[in-house]
From Swiss-Prot:
UniProt-annotated binding residues for a ubiquinone: 193
Keyword Transit peptide found: no
Cofactor(s) required, per the database record: heme b
Species, as recorded: Micrurus tener microgalbineus (Spotted coral snake)
Lineage, uppermost ranks: Eukaryota, Metazoa, Chordata, Craniata, Vertebrata
One Pfam family this sequence matches: Cytochrome_B
Protein name: Cytochrome b
Length: 371
């Protein structure tokens, strides 16, 4: 009977034999999520959501709490690692045409929006100079909403300016949203295993499947272990590599920061926002940069699912990756020439990908049919 149970467990999740390392980022994201919830819990024990005490409580965690600096830096670096894994996970989905599994893809986009909101609320909590100005600038975008904008902003602030109620609300939201993320992640995984994982060839995996354990579980374990090893190295050698020194100074409402740089996590979306001089236009660009990811499932025109055998689409895809890196880089720079021009051009390229890709895929199909 025990042998039958072992056989049942080992064959519980049949997976295509040829899925590559790019499929490992899902398990890495789950590891990041567990790490963030765990370190966040220990930080919440010592954190005080008060504008006069928040900054001091973060300093207290770093200096006085045993291993507090490890928790604080792991949480900060872990968030950046989380988003790096997410962006690679999304890029893999775009490259291999995984968006054709519509339910999984759309639940993933919802998950991304929730994660970005959580990261923003968390960025505000230390209440340093950069946190204060990021909160002021980003929440002010809500005033661009016609008719309701000012009322919504005042409601979110809990008054007519960013103050103690704002920080308390952001703390409560940052605490509750990870539980929503866990729920959405569960839905995402359930929907994925409803149809099963795709593979790099984009073919049906039913004819050649192997048990997930031990073949793929060990592969997942290797990349997850590599990430966990990278974390303490980064923690020890350069904990502020992905952060801004302005966050280490107390907030001063009278003096604006040189350039309000968002967290490394949401820098790409912030870069798109900054590239448009109009407030409403910038806000729409920020929203559309995420919502446009819902288009590929409905605009796929190629008869071949992945870009593996489509050289023109591949070229366009790698242009998108270069564009994304450029947007992220310009978002960390001051709002002055030539960064404004670079930011505007890269923003046009970013949105153009989602329009040009279906047209190029259709052209490729026509060329292949003729040859």
């Amino acid at each position: 009977m025990s042998n039958q149970h072992a056989l049942l467990i080992s064959n519980l999740l049949p997976v295509g034999s040829n899925i590559s390392t790019w499929w490992n980022f899902g398990s890495m994201l789950l590891t990041c999520l567990m790490l963030q919830v765990l370190t966040g819990f220990f930080l919440a024990i010592h954190y005080t959501a008060n504008i006069n005490l928040a900054f001091s409580s973060v300093v207290h965690i770093t200096r006085d709490v045993p291993c507090g600096w490890i928790m604080q830096n792991t949480h900060a670096i872990g968030a950046s690692l989380f988003f790096i894994c997410i962006y690679i996970h999304i890029a893999r989905g775009l490259y291999y045409g995984l968006y054709l599994n519509k339910n999984v893809w759309l639940s993933g986009v919802t998950l991304l929006m929730t994660l970005m909101a959580t990261a923003f609320f968390g960025y505000v909590l230390p209440w340093g100079q950069m946190s204060f100005w990021a909160a002021t600038v980003i929440t002010n975008l809500l005033t661009a909403i016609p008719y309701l904008g000012v009322a919504v902003t005042t409601w979110l602030w809990g008054g007519f300016s960013i103050n103690d109620p704002t920080l308390t609300r952001f703390c409560a939201l940052h605490f509750i949203l990870p539980f929503i993320i866990i729920s959405l992640s569960s839905i995402h995984i359930i929907l994925l295993h409803n149809e099963g994982s795709n593979n790099p060839l984009g073919t049906n995996s039913d004819i050649d499947k192997i048990p997930f354990h031990p073949y793929h579980s060990y592969k997942d374990f290797m990349t997850t272990t590599s990430m966990i090893i990278l974390l303490p190295i980064s923690l020890s050698v350069s904990p502020d590599l992905l952060x801004d020194p302005e966050k280490l100074t107390k907030p001063n409402p009278x003096x604006x920061x040189x350039x309000x740089x968002x967290x490394x996590x949401x820098x790409x979306x912030y870069g798109l926002l900054r590239s448009i001089p109009n407030k409403l236009g910038g806000t729409l660009a920020l929203l559309m940069s995420i919502l446009i990811l819902t288009l590929p499932p409905f605009t796929h025109t190629s008869y071949i699912r992945p870009m593996t055998f489509r050289p023109l689409s591949q070229t366009l895809f790698w242009t998108l990756i270069a564009t994304f890196v450029m947007i992220t880089w310009t978002a960390t720079k001051p709002v002055e020439p030539p960064f404004i021009t670079i930011s505007q051009l890269t923003s046009i390229f970013y949105f153009s990908f989602f329009i040009m890709n279906p047209l190029l895929s259709w052209t490729e199909h026509k060329i292949m049919m003729q040859s």
